Amino acid sequence: MTNTKYYPEVSSNADFAGLEREILKFWQDNNIFQKSIDDRNGESEFIFYDGPPFANGLPHYGHLLTGFIKDVYARYQTIKGKKVERRFGWDCHGLPAEMQSEKELGISGRLAIANFGIEKFNAHCRASVMKYANDWEEYVTRQARWVDFKNSYKTMDKNFMESVLWAFKELYNKGLLYESMRVMPYSWACETPLSNFETRLDNSYRERADKAVTVSFVLSHPVTTTTGSFKEYRILAWTTTPWTLPSNLALAVGSDIDYALVPKNDVCYIIAAYSVSKYAKELGLSGEENFEIIKGSALQGLNYKSLFDYFENHPNSFKIFAGDFVVEGDGTGVVHMAPGFGEDDQILCESKGIELVCPVDNSGKFTKEIPDLEGLQVFDANDKIIIKLKEQGNWLKTEQYIHNYPHCWRTDTPLIYKAVPSWYVKVTQFKDRMVELNQQINWIPFHVKDNLFGKWLENARDWSISRNRFWGTPLPVWKSDDPKYPRIDVYGSIEELEKDFGVKVTDLHRPFIDELTRPNPDDPTGKSTMRRIEDVFDCWFESGSMPYGQAHYPFENKEWFEDHFPADFIVEYSAQTRGWFYTLMVLSTALFDRPPFLNCICHGVILDSTGQKLSKRLNNYADPLELFDKYGSDALRVTMLSSNVVKGQELLIDKDGKMVFDTLRLFIKPIWNAYHFFTMYANADSLKGKLNFSSKNVLDVYILSKLKIAVQKIEESLDNFDTQTAYHAVSAFFEVLNNWYIRRSRARFWKSAKDTDKQNAYNTLYSCLDTMAIAMSALVPMISEAIYKGLRHCEERNDTALSGKSNIIARKDTSLDKAISGVSHKIATALSVPRNDAISVHLCNYPTLSDFEINHELVATMDNVLDICSNSLFIRSTENIRVRQPLASIAIISKHNNNLKDFEDLIKDEINVKAVIYRDDLENYASKKLSINFPMLGKRLPHKMKEIIAASKKGEWEAITGGLAICGETLNSDEYKLVLEPYSHIKGAASFENNSSLLILDLELTPELIEEGYARDIVRFIQQARKDADFSITDRILIEIISEFNLSKIIDNYGDFIKEQTLGEFAKNFTPDYVSKVALENHQIQLKVKKS
């Protein structure tokens, strides 16, 4: 008779990378991704915003991590019945694109770009920015992430740019924009200002050593409050930016700070009293002197002589003022003011009528206003300035100052602070509203809401949105070129531009947009012209415009946008609280008075195994494609998304991929092993599994109950955006499925009779694999697909199982069935997956098992049985007693033993003991010990921790209703745990996980027990020989054992047992198919086996 195989031949050592490539081809050939969207037409939608990356570099592990998270929730919401569009997007404009183009073209700086030609430069940017688009698609596809590349949006597309113009004009009309000359973080390497939040991206602060200099400024008049008289009065100021001293226009002191008048020769030095000791050497002090003290308020209004003559006639300058930003700490208590290079400096000087000076050009070099430093980069000028101060007699001290200093996020060069003209969004006008709207957002981790993001919103500042660069959406602002006839025009659409300028606008980029000019309508002479300002948008404004920009709102898709805003979900790494998340929030609040998204995950960063940032230069990470080809992408997905990185913490990943291999071994393989077991034995028996939940077998009921619990836990976890818990639920289920259900059901699968009990076992295992394949399909999309397809290798789902009618014949009552008698158990035959004809697991509906009722009593009891068995096996391991060695007994000591007696045979068989003994005198074997949760209790009672610890060790506590009394305090349930500990003289003991029961293994070995252990060893040796000989699991064999060790007694007593377990018969004088040599108690044994 032909053996019909209903399932594919599955190898236990699968090539998972090859398997994944087959699945990817299946998806592509059958257009599964598009089907998953089309099948949900008419259903409610799950709105997902895909943050646009730059395509001028290859994706790294951070991109893959974000992509995995995006894919999990998009797939999950799809099988939950939602329509989930996944349109990819590209960030195309801004510094990243320009810097890459400059590198490729071999040019650097604004002047070089202008000489090269803006049109040619931007054309190169346009081509360069999508350089790695195909590589991105390869990586994203290989990681099993489904996105729509064909309809991707690009921030450089005309439609997207027009929506950005609309947003700008809307803000302008609302009075939320203004133009100003203000001091900002400035990248001299990129020749552009940066927003304050850009200095907070990617840990842009670096430790830097600068030369700090203390300088003496000569007062123009004596300080009248002193009792003595001096030839000269000098006030000391300290700065870490000597290069700003040529631009000094004022000094600031603290009104309430004490200042000491320190005499040296005929000069009186004025310095904050708290700093005098720091300058003892320079001022010739012994430390015993007493000085006259005055308040800073007494210094206000005094004039001093300029350090240099560059701006000595600058109006209203060179006075001492009070500044509330001057506090005690570093320095001298005196701050030098250069309003062109400091925010506080500018604000204070502006209030005193002092106009700023800024003798530094766009590239960070001094201009001709400082002739002896002209053309010198500011940081390179420090030494020359210090030398000049020494020559003039104004220098007092130079020291090395190490501090965290902001660097450019693109070039990693140190920033300067510099006054530049810019357009600003009045974020401070509506920041309180942003704080309110933030309360509508669910943040993961939760603390981001009120801390990382919330605090940032509370301290939000006006946002500089203009950049004096080339490749970007141009600011739609035209100004009159004649200040006599001022006029500003702001445009919010192409239609408005075409109407006013009378030309067809086909490209909004520079230089084409710059060529649009027209006569100034407000100039009666007709001589002045309206010309566009040169600035382009900060690229963060464009990425923040993504929700409406991708839809070309409000010019098209108005209803679509309103239905798709805000997003249900977005995810990026935590620094985007200062980046994309923030700009989305600013623009959404200002334009729509709504939060831009409702759920947001802030994941952590991936570092190398030593905690360093992943870097091509350091060569400290493997190419992700290499890992995919070696272990598969599902393994990398699990590695990342089951870790704390999804909770905002760091993930250290090794270059060699050991972590991913461990995931493959510990997570993926157990899933595959269960599937392999099913297909192997089902094919051997020519049986088909059916989707059926009606078996009364206690192991079947237990594993199906555990299945539903796992399915519910996965659903609950993913509903709460918690992949970590979801993966744990999958792993925990397959641990029980493999190491308990399948192991305890082996006899049912192995027996030759194809009875109802055997069919029930196959149905139950099939139902578990089928259901979990769907439930975990978002978490491991490719192995789930492989299992799902394999289970449907030769047929559609079982119609009977789905119809709700059962054709399963009831088993006769057994001892195991009695274990669930009297316990409410609703027989179920259906799984809630109505789309039973789906060709892909990702086209199914999430399983609910609504017609199957969990047997909680059975689960609790069986979990206790597992606890007993796992503890017993651990004790065996500790005592070096192999599992095949029988033991006399196990004692279970508990007040509640009745529910375990029905499982006595199972316990005896699993842990290999002859008897189970029950006791209830727990107090004779163990006692409760108090374990304190120090982090939790320490928050509430830090002052009593020492006393509580001492009392807990002495046993001076009492369990009371609702808690535990100790040291006059009542501890809450999450602040302590009572642990059951066996007395030290009790051997072979362990407490249950619930700390209410104890087990004790009898570890004494009698000769009879040892003999039986040898018999079991022989069985294992024969089974291994069968496997090594590549025999089928159904092959019957002949066995011959040749040994220097006398085995006759063992064979006489246990021969039948050995033959039954190995499908063998003892024989002699045959030609073996396979021979092996093994050791039994240091004696050599030769095994010969042959198919019979």
UniProtKB/Swiss-Prot annotation:
Q: One cellular component GO annotation, for this chain's record? A: cytoplasm
Family annotation (Pfam families):
Anticodon_1, DUF5915, tRNA-synt_1
Which principal EC class is assigned to this enzyme?
ligase
Give the EC number(s) under which this enzyme is classified. Answer: 6.1.1.5
**Per UniProt, which keywords does this protein have?**
Aminoacyl-tRNA synthetase, ATP-binding, Cytoplasm, Ligase, Metal-binding, Nucleotide-binding, Protein biosynthesis, Zinc
Q: Where in the cell is it found?
A: Cytoplasm
Residues crossing the lipid bilayer are none
Cofactor(s) listed: Zn(2+)
Q: Which reaction does it catalyse?
A: tRNA(Ile) + L-isoleucine + ATP = L-isoleucyl-tRNA(Ile) + AMP + diphosphate
Enumerate the Gene Ontology biological process terms. isoleucyl-tRNA aminoacylation
Q: Motif 'KMSKS' region in this chain: where?
A: 613-617
Binding positions for ATP per the UniProt entry: 616
Superkingdom of this entry's organism? Bacteria
Keyword match Zinc? yes
Task: Please tell me whether the keyword Heme is annotated for this protein.
Answer: no
Q: What is the residue range of the motif 'HIGH' region?
A: 53-63
The entry lists its GO molecular-function terms as: aminoacyl-tRNA deacylase activity; ATP binding; isoleucine-tRNA ligase activity; tRNA binding; zinc ion binding
Q: Which NCBIfam families match?
A: ileS
For this chain, the family text in UniProt reads: Belongs to the class-I aminoacyl-tRNA synthetase family. IleS type 2 subfamily.
The free-text function statement in the UniProt record for this protein reads: Catalyzes the attachment of isoleucine to tRNA(Ile). As IleRS can inadvertently accommodate and process structurally similar amino acids such as valine, to avoid such errors it has two additional distinct tRNA(Ile)-dependent editing activities. One activity is designated as 'pretransfer' editing and involves the hydrolysis of activated Val-AMP. The other activity is designated 'posttransfer' editing and involves deacylation of mischarged Val-tRNA(Ile).
| UniProt xrefs under HAMAP family | Ile_tRNA_synth_type2 (MF_02003)
The domain-related comment in the record is: IleRS has two distinct active sites: one for aminoacylation and one for editing. The misactivated valine is translocated from the active site to the editing site, which sterically excludes the correctly activated isoleucine. The single editing site contains two valyl binding pockets, one specific for each substrate (Val-AMP or Val-tRNA(Ile)).
The subunit structure is:
Monomer.
The name on file for this protein is Isoleucine--tRNA ligase
Gene assigned in the entry: ileS
